Amino acid sequence: MLTSKQRAILRGKANTMDPVFIVGKGEIDETMIQGVKDCLDARELIKLKVLESSMYNAREASVKLAEATGADCVQVIGSKFVLYLQKKKDSSYADLLK
């Protein structure tokens, strides 16, 4: 669980990021969950976008993906949201989040 101060730091880092995943009109299935897990393992902090034609809104998609991957939801704004999952070793954000 992130504190509000840690969440603010991560929001600042995610501000300039482009979305790496897009939630479309299909279900959030195992393939997408595995792709998000792989991306979180590589980057720790990712931004995702939900299309207007999706059956989910950004809040619903963020909750579902955060639960499925074990990540923390950092921010939800409009159709975009940010997820964070700290690496066990060599975390890029560990020093910032102390």
Predicted features and spans:
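Positively charged, polar, low-complexity stretches
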Residues: 1-98
